[in-house]
């Protein structure tokens, strides 16, 4: 063999070795296209989805086991001072105003007797927010702290609490709803910033034992929904198949939603608006009957309430599509077992048994996502990932642990949009159909 050929052969071998470590886009694209040929007819995938939906409709609600049932009964006794955890419930306006009146009268009597006044507020400190395996959600331990109008350090917080109680009382008496922003702007100088009024609003919910929606104070619209769903919004009939690419805004007043109907086989929960728009424009819900919703990032209260209500009333499985990074998993965990800042209302805000469809860390190699479409994890990403591994609700799911360990080992993350490197419609035409066909969720 000539020296030239030997050099050429060595060079080719080196190039081949390099390619095996980092697939060229053309190689990855070729493999991605080969996956398309593995797709079975839609009728076969639909049969799989019907079986999943049927099994979900027959299964007992999460937390209905004997141990969870007894725990739920104990928690439901919201007026029982011996109850270990706080549970709030929806209440009508008359009940909430009556409770506010009793608080104010007690404060007035205390002042007239010369003792001053103090609010007994459930402590929402981090140490009181715990994950309860039997209920599969984060709950708030029942511990109270005093908020007296006694000195400079406590008087301002007590004043803000009294002001919020007064504003909520006025809103309920008028029978209207206001946003958290509206509430803040009623007394900007007192509140200082909206974080103050928002935090006290949560305190008031705990004090009164009611959900925040019972206070008639809501967040601005954020989440959207599209797909095989119809419902009445304050009497107006909404057809979510006719909402266009942007979808229908999820109403902030979930109590005004009624008449929910659907022929969907599953609910697809999407982390980001970009993926939602792709799914909506391609009318993915017509090919595979589903309801698609997103909170466009961090889950807001209205979207969490709406998702839970759809799950409970329609008895459909929920599949989640999030970024392959620690924050995608954190967002998924908020939907499933709640957030710590609203742990007092986790019974109403959580949707257990959401199945993690993608994009999972193991998918990056399985679907040969090109290296240039992956991102290196930052030190902060790694820190968040390690913290997640220590969370009890993560330890309960072996699949989550394995995926997180894969992410931390490879130190790589990727957004849902990384799949667009194979084509803008690869998500809807290949990736998701193949995932559904293979029942590839955890």
From Swiss-Prot:
Organism: Oryza sativa subsp. indica
Protein name as annotated: DNA topoisomerase 6 subunit A3
Requisite cofactors: Mg(2+)
Tissue specificity comment: Highly expressed in flowers before pollination. Expressed in roots and shoots.
One Pfam assignment: TOP6A-Spo11_Toprim
Gene: TOP6A3
Catalyzed reactions: ATP-dependent breakage, passage and rejoining of double-stranded DNA
Family the entry assigns: Belongs to the TOP6A family.
UniProt induction comment: By auxin, abscisic acid (ABA) and benzylaminopurine.
Active site per the UniProt annotation: 185 (o-(5'-phospho-dna)-tyrosine intermediate)
EC numbers on record: 5.6.2.2
């Amino acid at each position: 063999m000539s020296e030239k050929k030997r050099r050429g052969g060595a060079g080719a071998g080196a190039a081949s070795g390099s390619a095996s470590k980092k697939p060229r886009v053309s190689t990855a694209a070729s493999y991605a296209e080969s996956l398309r040929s593995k797709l079975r007819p839609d009728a076969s995938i639909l049969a799989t989805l019907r079986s999943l939906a049927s099994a979900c409709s027959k299964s007992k609600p999460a937390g209905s086991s004997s141990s969870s049932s007894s725990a739920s009964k104990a928690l439901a006794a919201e007026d029982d001072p011996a109850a270990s955890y706080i549970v709030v419930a929806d209440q009508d306006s008359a009940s909430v105003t009556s409770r506010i009146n009793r608080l104010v009268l007690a404060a007035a009597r205390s002042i007239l007797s010369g003792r001053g006044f103090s609010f007994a507020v459930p402590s929402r400190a981090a140490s009181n927010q715990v994950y309860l395996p039997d209920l599969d959600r984060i709950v708030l331990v029942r511990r109270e702290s005093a908020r007296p109008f006694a000195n400079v350090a406590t008087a301002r917080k007590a004043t803000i609490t009294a002001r919020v109680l007064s504003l909520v009382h006025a809103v309920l008496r008028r029978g209207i709803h206001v946003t958290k922003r509206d509430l803040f702007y009623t007394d900007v100088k007192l509140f200082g910033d909206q974080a103050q009024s928002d935090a006290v609003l949560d305190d008031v919910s705990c004090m009164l034992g009611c959900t925040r929606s019972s206070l008639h104070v809501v967040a601005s619209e954020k989440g959207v929904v599209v797909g095989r769903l119809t419902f009445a919004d304050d009497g107006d009939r909404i057809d979510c198949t006719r909402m266009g690419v942007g979808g229908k805004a999820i109403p902030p007043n979930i109590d005004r939603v009624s008449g929910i109907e659907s022929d969907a086989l599953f609910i697809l929960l999407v982390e980001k608006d970009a993926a939602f728009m792709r799914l909506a424009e391609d009318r993915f819900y017509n090919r595979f009957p589903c309801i698609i919703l997103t909170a466009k990032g961090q889950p807001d209260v209205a979207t969490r309430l709406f998702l839970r209500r759809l799950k409970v009333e329609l008895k459909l499985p929920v599949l989640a599509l999030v970024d392959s990074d620690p924050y995608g998993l954190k967002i998924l965990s908020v939907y499933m077992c709640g957030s710590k800042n609203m742990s007092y209302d986790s019974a109403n805000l959580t949707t257990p048994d959401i199945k993690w469809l993608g994009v999972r860390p193991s998918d990056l190699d399985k679907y040969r996502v090109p290296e240039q479409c992956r991102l290196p994890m930052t030190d902060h990403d790694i820190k968040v990932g390690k913290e997640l591994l220590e969370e009890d609700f993560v330890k309960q799911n072996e699949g989550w642990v394995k995926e997180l360990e894969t992410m931390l080992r490879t130190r790589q993350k990727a957004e849902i949009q990384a799949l667009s490197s194979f084509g803008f419609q690869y998500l809807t035409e290949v990736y998701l159909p193949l995932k559904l066909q293979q029942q590839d969720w955890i």
